[in-house]
Design a protein with these regions (language model features):
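Active-site helix of classical SDR
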Residues: 142-145
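NAD(P)-dependent short-chain dehydrogenase/reductase
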Residues: 148-202, 207-216, 247-249
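N-terminal Rossmann NAD(P)H-binding glycine-rich loop of SDR-like oxidoreductase domains
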Residues: 3-23
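N-terminal Rossmann-fold cofactor-binding loop
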Residues: 30-35, 54
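NAD(P)H-binding glycine-rich loop region in Rossmannoid oxidoreductase-like domains
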Residues: 51-91
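Rossmann-fold scaffold of SDR-type NAD(P)-dependent oxidoreductases
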Residues: 6, 68-73, 113-114, 232
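C-terminal substrate-binding subdomain of Rossmann-fold SDR/epimerase-dehydratase oxidoreductases
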Residues: 195-299
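Conserved Rossmann-fold NAD(P)-dependent oxidoreductase catalytic core, especially the SDR/UDP-sugar
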Residues: 72, 76, 97-138
Length: 299
């Protein structure tokens, strides 16, 4: 199939394009930097580098005449500070709707965009696709509004919409300030790590498994084996955060001191996603265990 992927050189985008090319799909990789696309995937006849700013997505059909699936991953301002910027998130939402309209002009059979666990707001309950949403950050508010706007546009232009509600993804290329990246860096150096009590439940999904899930889900929806709509994107491994941290130390053979309780947090929230809907749609959720993912990241 022919895939259009915006944000193709980003964290999740690169993993997705890698996987799509690996299993034989044709990819139109949309990025602000054509040179970066060419550097990531040189001499591959199945990839087409498309240079386009997010504000210009409405003109993408001038460079791409037809495709099967449009996966919109580009989203400006994903740092902690930017997630509270209402103006920036509003621009993101407008770009998403432009992308959806142009996907219809390309005769795509499916439009895919990414939501977030931030749509729910703080919670310690198990979350499902039907759980109530009470976002507190502009980022979560915009993702939820994007869902509503895309669903309305989906009906208006008759283009199925897939809303990937991402939970907690990790892997090479992620922001260096994330817990996993920070812990790996300090563990490999044997440096002490200040942590909260880490008693809450959490769920980590390896970015390569995320790419696998996206492709499998798109294929299932295209073949009418699954319905479009909201899907929680997570792994089959939910447990205490402390269990993850202890496993990281063991796998990386680290001597780092783990200072539980050194970081005081005002609000402790868990991430406990129900993945039954996704599992029913695609079957197996993971190709990598947490340990296998950590080892793969060191290659």
């Amino acid at each position: 199939m022919k895939y259009v992927v915006t944000g193709a050189t980003g964290f999740i985008g690169k993993a997705l394009v890698d996987y799509l090319l690996q299993i034989g799909h044709e990819v139109y990789a949309v990025s602000r930097s054509k040179e970066r696309v060419d550097a990531f995937w040189p001499d591959n006849k199945n990839i087409h580098a498309i240079s386009c700013e997010m504000g210009d997505y409405a003109q993408l059909n001038e460079q791409i005449s037809d495709a099967d699936v449009f996966v919109h991953l580009a989203w400006a301002g994903t740092t902690v500070e930017d997630r509270y910027s209402t103006d920036l998130q509003e621009k993101n939402m407008r770009s998403t709707l432009d992308a959806m309209r142009v996907a219809k002009q390309m005769n795509c059979r499916l439009f895919v965009a990414t939501g977030s666990q931030a749509e729910y707001g703080p919670t310690n309950d198990m979350i499902t696709e039907l759980s109530p949403c009470h976002p507190v950050m502009a980022y979560g508010v915009s993702k939820l509004r994007m869902l509503e706007e895309c669903c309305a546009l989906s009906e208006q232009i008759n283009l199925p919409y897939l809303h990937l509600r991402i939970c907690s993804v990790f892997g090479k290329g992620d922001h260096p300030y994330t817990l996993i990246e920070t812990a790996i860096s300090r563990m490999l150096k044997g440096e002490p790590i200040d942590l909260s009590e880490c008693t809450q439940n959490w769920n980590f999904l390896y970015v390569k498994d995320m790419a696998y899930q996206i492709e499998r889900l798109c294929k299932a929806v295209i073949k009418n084996d699954a319905q479009p709509g909201i899907y929680l994107m997570a792994s089959n491994d939910t447990r205490t955060l402390k269990s993850y941290i202890e496993e990281m130390k063991r796998v990386l053979k680290s001597s780092a001191e783990l200072r539980y309780g050194a970081l005081k947090t005002k609000q402790v929230t868990s991430l406990n996603p129900d993945t039954s809907k996704l599992k029913n749609a695609i079957g197996k959720l993971n190709n990598y265990s947490f340990e296998q993912a950590l080892l793969d990241m060191q290659k």
